[in-house]
């Protein structure tokens, strides 16, 4: 294999690797966006849950009716 052919082969490999790296980077960026949205949704669900627990916890503190 001549030196020129080896250089062409290496340049071709580098081009494919660059494309692969860019595709992987794009995927990581998209996954980061998804994770961020999921974190916001989980935080909202936790907030709702705590509000619901607070509403129901207050009802259990009332004294029983006099006939008990």
Swiss-Prot record:
Belongs to the SlyX family. InterPro entries: SlyX. This is Protein SlyX homolog. Gene3D superfamilies: 1.20.5.300. Signal peptide: none annotated. Pfam families: SlyX.
């Amino acid at each position: 294999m001549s030196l020129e052919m080896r250089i062409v082969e290496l340049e071709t490999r580098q081009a494919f690797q660059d494309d692969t790296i860019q595709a992987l980077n794009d995927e990581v960026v998209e996954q980061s966006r998804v994770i961020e949205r999921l974190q916001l949704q989980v935080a909202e669900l936790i907030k709702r849950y705590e509000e619901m627990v607070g509403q129901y916890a207050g009802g259990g503190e009332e004294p029983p009716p006099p006939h008990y």
